[in-house]
């Protein structure tokens, strides 16, 4: 079983994973940890170009994808904390897992209420008044996951309440995401 817990910063991904006993026996992976390691391996300074930043993020995504696949091949259950706003970022992970296993892949999209998001933002940075609006804008950019991407089940999590939903993505949108991925390589 692979469970992807996705969403913007400060939406409660880490809290959900840490406070869910189901994940005690799961291998836990957090994209933030992979990004930090990739940044360190690249010896990147604070001021890097967009191309360098993209390369670091790409490397982190490749490493977490490979680690997910290795854990699945070893028969382990995995929970992954990630942003994965775009379908084109989710597809390589799904396809890599499917290449080695038919294990269920579930995705959980964090969608806190404004009240909960404001509390989360205040816990992260009491001084930054723009954090809340910035994250609200990020949340609008998320492409809602669907079963047609290859997920066994799709869920929203709103203030701790887990709600299963079904939606189908337009085949043209799926094809566009695959084309964008191909063009990036």
Model-derived regions, located:
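Conserved beta-strand scaffold positions in the cores of enzyme catalytic domains, especially
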Residues: 25-30, 106-109, 154-156
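Pre-Walker A (Motif I) flank of P-loop NTPase domains
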Residues: 1-3, 75-76
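Flexible, glycine- and charge-enriched loops at secondary-structure boundaries
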Residues: 50-58, 83, 128, 132
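Glycine-rich phosphate-binding loop used to anchor ATP phosphates in small-molecule kinases
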Residues: 55-104
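Short glycine-/polar-rich loops that comprise or flank the Walker A/P-loop
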Residues: 100-106, 148-153
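Conserved GTP-binding G-domain of TRAFAC-class P-loop NTPases and closely related GTPase folds
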Residues: 2-6, 11-15, 19, 23, ...
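Short, hinge-like loop/turn segments at secondary-structure boundaries
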Residues: 44-48, 98, 123-127
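Conserved substrate/cofactor phosphate-moiety recognition/catalytic segment
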Residues: 14-76
């Amino acid at each position: 079983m692979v469970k992807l817990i996705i969403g913007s910063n400060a939406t409660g991904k880490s809290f959900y994973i840490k406070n869910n006993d189901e994940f005690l026996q799961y291998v836990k992976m957090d994209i933030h940890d992979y990004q930090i390691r990739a940044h360190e391996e690249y010896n990147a300074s604070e001021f890097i170009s967009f191309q360098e930043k993209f390369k670091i993020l790409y490397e982190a995504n490749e490493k977490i994808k490979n680690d997910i696949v290795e854990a699945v091949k070893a028969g382990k259950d995995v929970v992954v904390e990630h942003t994965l706003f775009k379908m084109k970022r989710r597809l390589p992970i799904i396809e890599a897992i499917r290449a080695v296993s038919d294990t269920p892949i579930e995705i959980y999209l964090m969608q806190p209420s404004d009240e909960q998001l404001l509390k989360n933002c205040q816990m992260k940075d009491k001084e930054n008044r723009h954090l809340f609006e910035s994250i609200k804008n990020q949340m609008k950019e998320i492409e809602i996951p669907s079963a047609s991407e290859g997920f066994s089940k799709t869920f929203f999590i709103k203030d701790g309440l887990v709600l299963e939903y079904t939606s189908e993505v337009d085949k043209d949108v799926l094809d566009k995401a695959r084309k964008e991925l191909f063009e990036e390589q």
